[in-house]
Amino acid sequence: MAHPYYPAGNPRFNHVAMSLPADLLGEESRSDICSFFEEVLGFEEMAVMTEDRRRLILSCVHWDQFIFLISEDDPMKCPQMDHYGFAVNSLDDLKGIQQRAEAFRKKDDRLKLIDLHMDDQGVVKIHSLYVSHILPMTCEVQYWEFPENPKPYVPAATAG
């Protein structure tokens, strides 16, 4: 059933924006950023939108979902675990990202990876990994597995 505010369908995220120092949007660093996103996640530069040292937009497989990078004199700074997330449709897709990230890290040690792990909530198993490269925010990728006969969720006991 549709939400009453959105009878045409649920809204969805369409982009994430981050500010960077202009040097990171210069030709060499921009090329490194594009290589990571293309080789690991399959995202492509929207070259017609690129402005050297000013703007880079990466299409997240479809043109209406993207990462928007813009230069700023006072660029974004955040802790490593501040992140944005994507979902994939299979555990094999997620494992593929892990494999490509590991391969990419062999040639560029700036890639940081928190390996594939699973959080079993009983009704859903959330498989995820975290990967970052150059940008201030980390990317989390998840696959949600819904078991046929889920266990009831039991919250962890709190220490007292």
Regions found by a protein language model. Give the residues of each.
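Core segments of cupin and vicinal oxygen chelate
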Residues: M18-F66
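Short, well-ordered turn and helix-capping elements at secondary-structure junctions
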Residues: L20-A22, S71-D73, H117
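A short, hydrophobic/aromatic-rich structural module that often spans a beta strand
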Residues: M46, D52-A87, D93, A156
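A short, terminal or domain-edge coil/loop segment
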Residues: W63-D74, G96-K112
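Vicinal oxygen chelate
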Residues: M1-G26, M76-G160
